Amino acid sequence: RVPVPLPLAACWQRRVLGYQAAIITQRIEKAQPIAQYIEKIPPESVAIVVKQMHDAGVWHADLNVFNLLIDAQQQIYVIDFDRARRFDVVDSKHRQNNLLRLRRSLIKVRGEIGQQWYEQFRRAYLQLAKA
């Protein structure tokens, strides 16, 4: 099970070239993007959530430090599944794509600290993949 905000309502409207959709989710009290707190967040806890998402067959189109939230209880949540895709199995290419997108985001927002944190996250993710 992937930790996400509880969906409350959704709608969609047909357009000439596709559709437009919206979803309203429950607010997660005191949740903040992980970008501001990576020094305090164990990379392993984020690796577990990202691995759960991939194991559930979900590929996130924009996995970045603003689409991973942490609440006051240190629970990690994934948000913004716009353009996400569902697969029977998320293959290694798509998994790697997600990890590299997160890496770019970490480096852009947090520089060297982001790079160091990502390396720990990646090691944890790969360890989980072996288990």
Describe the function of each predicted region.
Residues 1-32, 51-56:
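Conserved ATP-binding subdomain of kinase catalytic cores across diverse folds
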Residues 3, 42, 94-97:
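Glycine-rich, phosphate-binding/catalytic loops in enzymes
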Residues 29, 65, 83:
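Short, glycine/acidic-enriched loop or turn micro-motifs at the edges of active sites
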Residues 31-39:
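AlphaC helix of the protein kinase catalytic domain
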Residues 41-52:
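Conserved alphaE helix
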Residues 57, 62, 80:
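Conserved catalytic-loop position in the HRD/HxD motif
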Residues 63-70:
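Hydrophobic residue at the +6 position relative to the catalytic HRD Asp in the kinase catalytic loop
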Residues 71, 76-131:
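C-lobe/activation-segment region of protein kinase-like
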